[in-house]
């Protein structure tokens, strides 16, 4: 399946919630009719079956993190192999992706922008350039914006935008040096309450 390159608003409208796919300069509801699905009959949202609810939740989270179906399934398989709550572990794996950590640290305004920054070799992990967006960041790892990228206006804008987001206890960021440390594993209590990971587990468990 190819990566979606169309209007970001359409994805958020499809899921009926803000997927944080845009920079946040303007509230999504200023342009996007969040309560209306895209399409000619979008005003009438069909009542979903249990399977439909599970599928929509999976699609919502997959689109939120910008991950293709096959890769998302692999994260579920890995989470199910580990001890503990499978749903919480799944979100921990997604949050620990390098592109997401770069976004959470405020070095990019969106996850898509963070992915591009990583792919274009603008990010170092523990002093070494890493251009793999899916690379797993571990507790104690130091993520730094490379010198050649620090002057990019989009990064400076992202840092300013990040000041208005809630600080997370599991990362520590120095906005002057554009360097951050992942202090611990992502904390589920600090992640979106709008995600019902149990529905995803039920979908894949069938």
From Swiss-Prot:
GO function term, MF aspect, one: rRNA binding
One GO cellular component term noted in the UniProt record for this chain: small ribosomal subunit
Domain of life, source organism: Bacteria
GO biological process: ribosomal small subunit biogenesis; translation
Keywords assigned: Ribonucleoprotein, Ribosomal protein, RNA-binding, rRNA-binding
SUPFAM superfamilies, per the entry: Alpha-L RNA-binding motif (SSF55174)
Keyword 4Fe-4S on entry: no
InterPro entries linked to this entry: Ribosomal_uS4, Ribosomal_uS4_bac-type, Ribosomal_uS4_CS, Ribosomal_uS4_N, S4_RNA-bd, S4_RNA-bd_sf
Limits of the S4 RNA-binding domain: 96-158
Iron-sulfur is among the record's keywords: no
Function: One of the primary rRNA binding proteins, it binds directly to 16S rRNA where it nucleates assembly of the body of the 30S subunit. With S5 and S12 plays an important role in translational accuracy.
Subunit relationships: Part of the 30S ribosomal subunit. Contacts protein S5. The interaction surface between S4 and S5 is involved in control of translational fidelity.
Similarity comment text for this entry: Belongs to the universal ribosomal protein uS4 family.
Designated name of the protein: Small ribosomal subunit protein uS4
Species in which this protein is naturally found: Francisella tularensis subsp. tularensis (strain WY96-3418)
Gene (UniProt): rpsD
């Amino acid at each position: 399946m190819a990566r979606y390159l169309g209007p970001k608003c359409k994805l958020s409208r499809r899921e009926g919630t803000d997927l944080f796919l845009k920079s946040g300069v303007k509230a999504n509801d200023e342009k996007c009719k969040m309560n209306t699905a895209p399409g000619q009959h979008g005003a009438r949202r069909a009542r979903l079956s249990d399977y439909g609810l599970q599928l929509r939740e999976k699609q919502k989270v997959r689109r939120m993190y910008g991950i293709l179906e096959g890769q998302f399934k692999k994260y579920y398989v890995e989470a199910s192999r580990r001890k503990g709550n499978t749903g919480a572990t799944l979100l921990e794996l997604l949050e620990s992706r390098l592109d997401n950590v770069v976004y959470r640290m405020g070095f990019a305004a969106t996850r898509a922008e963070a992915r591009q920054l990583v792919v274009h070799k603008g990010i170092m992990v523990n002093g070494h350039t890493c251009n793999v967006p899916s690379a797993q960041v571990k507790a104690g790892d130091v993520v730094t914006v490379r010198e050649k990228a620090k002057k990019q206006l989009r990064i400076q804008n992202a840092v300013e935008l990040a000041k208005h987001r809630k600080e997370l206890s599991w990362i520590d960021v120095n906005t002057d040096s554009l360097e951050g440390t992942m202090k611990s594993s992502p904390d589920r209590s600090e992640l979106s309450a709008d995600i019902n990971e149990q529905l995803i587990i039920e979908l894949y468990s069938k």
